[in-house]
Amino acid sequence: HPPVAIEDFFIAEQIEDYYLLFGQLVKYKRADLAIEAFNRLGKPLLVIGEGEMLPQLKRMANDNIRFLGKQPFEQVRHYLAHCKALIFPGVEDFGIVPVEAMASGRPVIAFAAGGALETVAEHTTGLLFREQTPESLISAIESFEQIQSKFSPESIRGHAKDFGRNTFKRNIKQVIDAQLSEV
């Protein structure tokens, strides 16, 4: 997996009352699941990103969902650091955004597939939902609301460091050293 610039993110003193969906708004990222779930829950959701699904998602969304479009990195950092949790409903080979949220000390609520299985440590750095349905996501969010105080921003950030540049460099060096020792 690619290295993530953990040091570019920070832990906020105050968490605000919103969940965050961040990324390209294309079909396979399944933002529609998040929109449907948050329409039913009525909880605040901020959506950062652009893409072919944006017009359809805006038409679907109730007033508790705000679309912020593309944002500069400084704003993205702010929203990541202050959200209750990142919502990650799609399947990615790796998925850098969940690790960026964790680098900000924030839990991730992700679909249990692809890279999220490697990056999200259940009940330590977030929660996984097992079916790619609004109902399954709603259930995970409701569970999160019951236990959110148990998540430690420092522990979450510590876990993110496993995917940082220093770990990446160390792992690459070990692979190269092992190959060179066989020559």
Model-derived regions, located:
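Short hydrophobic beta-strand element within catalytic cores of glycosyltransferases
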Residues: I87, P107-A112, V120
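Short alpha-helical donor nucleotide-sugar binding micro-motif in glycosyltransferases
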Residues: H78-C83, I172
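Conserved donor-binding/catalytic core segment of Leloir-type glycosyltransferases
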Residues: V4-L46
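Nucleotide-activated donor-binding/catalytic signature segment of Leloir-type glycosyltransferases, i.e.
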Residues: L54-R77
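Acidic donor-binding loop of glycosyltransferase active sites
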Residues: A81-D93, R106
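A charged, aromatic-enriched C-terminal amphipathic alpha-helix characteristic of glycosyltransferases
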Residues: Q132, S149-A178
